[in-house]
Structures are given as C-alpha cells and as structure tokens.
Amino acid sequence: MAEASIQIEVVYATVQRQVLMTVDVPAGSSVRQALALCGMDREFPELDLSHCPVGIFGKVVADPAARVLEAGERIEIYRPLLADPMEIRRLRAAKAREKRTLPG
C-alpha cells in the first residue's frame, strides 16, 4: 500500500527571481524533511537549506526538524538581511537632520 502524502508549497525569492513549488511529501514530514525533498537547492545552488531561517505563512519556525507539516501549508525560505535595520534607520535619520539644517 502506498504511503499517504500531502501537498505543500515551498517558496523562495531573490531580487531577480521568485520560485513557488508545489510538492507532494509523505504525511508526517517535518519542515526540514520537506525542504530536503523539494529541490529548491537545485534551483538556487547558493542556498544552504540546513541553515536558512524558514517560516510557515509568515511565522518563523523555531525548530524545522520538529515541526510537522499539514496539507496546504506554505514553507517560506528567508534570505539573510543585506543591512542591519537599526543602522539603516540611523542613517536615514542623520540624512533627514542634515536636510533640515542646510540653508535653503
């Protein structure tokens, strides 16, 4: 008898390209197992799926190896930030202060 499977989605995006895959995985699969099966690392060879932060419908999954998937869920693979958000805000505030103090 065939093992029951569920259908999930896996999504990843870069600046240049977005990919959404629909994948059948065995029922009871963890997020980590589904990532190993999905093939996203073949689409994006630079992607290290064992260390990427992931989420399901916008909520970060703390332990992808323990989180069991349900049918219809979407795994989102997150990219690292290119810049520190606090530093960006600091620079933006400094630039705004500069504009206010320049004679105009």
From Swiss-Prot:
Pfam families: Ub-RnfH
InterPro entries: Mopterin_synth/thiamin_S_b, RnfH, RnfH_sf
Superkingdom, taxonomy of origin: Bacteria
Family classification: Belongs to the UPF0125 (RnfH) family.
HAMAP family recorded: UPF0125_RnfH (MF_00460)
Protein name: UPF0125 protein PSPTO_4512
Species per Swiss-Prot/TrEMBL record: Pseudomonas syringae pv. tomato (strain ATCC BAA-871 / DC3000)
Biological classification of the source: Bacteria, Pseudomonadati, Pseudomonadota, Gammaproteobacteria, Pseudomonadales
